[in-house]
Curated annotation (Swiss-Prot):
GO molecular function terms noted in the UniProt entry: structural molecule activity
Organism the protein comes from: Aliivibrio salmonicida (strain LFI1238) (Vibrio salmonicida (strain LFI1238))
Superkingdom of source: Bacteria
GO biological process entries: bacterial-type flagellum-dependent cell motility
Primary location class: periplasm
Gene name in the database record: flgI
Protein name per UniProt: Flagellar P-ring protein
Amino acid sequence: MTNRWSFDVKKNLVTLILTWLCLSISTAQAARIKDVSEVAGVRSNQLIGYGLVSGLPGTGESTPFTDQSFNAMLQNFGIQLPPGTKPKTKNVAAVMVTTTLPAFAKQGQVVDITVSSVGSAKSLRGGTLLQTFLKGLDGKTYAIAQGNLIVSGFSATGADGSKIVGNNPTVGRISGGAMVEREVPSPFGRGDFITFNLLDSDFTTAQRMADAVNNFLGPNMASAVDATSVRVRAPRDISQRVAFLSAVENVNFDPADGSAKIIVNSRTGTIVVGKHVRLRAAAVTHGGMTVAIKENQQVSQPGPFGNGKTVVTQDSDIEVTEKQGKMFKFEPGLTLDDLVRAVNEVGAAPSDLMAILQALKQAGAIEGQLIII
């Protein structure tokens, strides 16, 4: 298909670079396309494999599946154990090996891997991962892993059974421990369009991105498909396409502000409030009741020459304290900062604020989403 990118590459690139520099200077505070989106089809892939770690100083395991894996490995080297023989493999551990294959990873490149025990091994420190095939979702082998583990954790056991464990000794890493043997096909060089997918879906942001690209390249070169995707017409020639994408992904534009949200982590008490959250007219009162129970043990001691027995009795002291909650009244249009400030002035805990937020949302007094994680 013929488009405005079919003319001379050098002239094309010079024009793009000059335009990009002008836009970068004029919109220095805006976001680049590459910072808020990713190219469709350009993605990483997860790989996984099952293997053995050997050379452990007695911290390995002797589980049935480890023994089976060890015997299978010996058979691959032509070693056949006598029937009924059970090897003592305290220096061997069964492990799972995982890694992420980056986009455009080429044959012969290396990637980091993570090795984790799947059995009862006490520690992987000092071990060596034996050759392990790493496969993708399609069952094909894309990388082969092997190497010496680096384990940050430690484990020590005393003769009396006491044990000290620091960090996690059953998980280790090997830097550059896997070599890529098969490349993953990429759709990057196919078709007449490049699609950018926003990291945070938003209709306004998608339209603004398309408008910015059209201002940069010319009319009708980009269009917003939906709240996530923006499709840009691109040259078919792969060398031109790389230069084209390099210029387009550095175009600056102003993303839309996110929708009004309140994120509450009920486990840690963390509360994050978006700047567009508003309150409607509401009155809030929140009081707390504290129940304290103290258990005191009383000992009844009989006389020295009596036939009585020493008896321990329980004496419970229960105290109930209720705080008188203050009432807060908010006018419509106030931000959540006003609520947080008012609650903090009376020394309320984060749990109190979470309860107030939930009640306000149920009453329809919060203009925004309340998300509890």
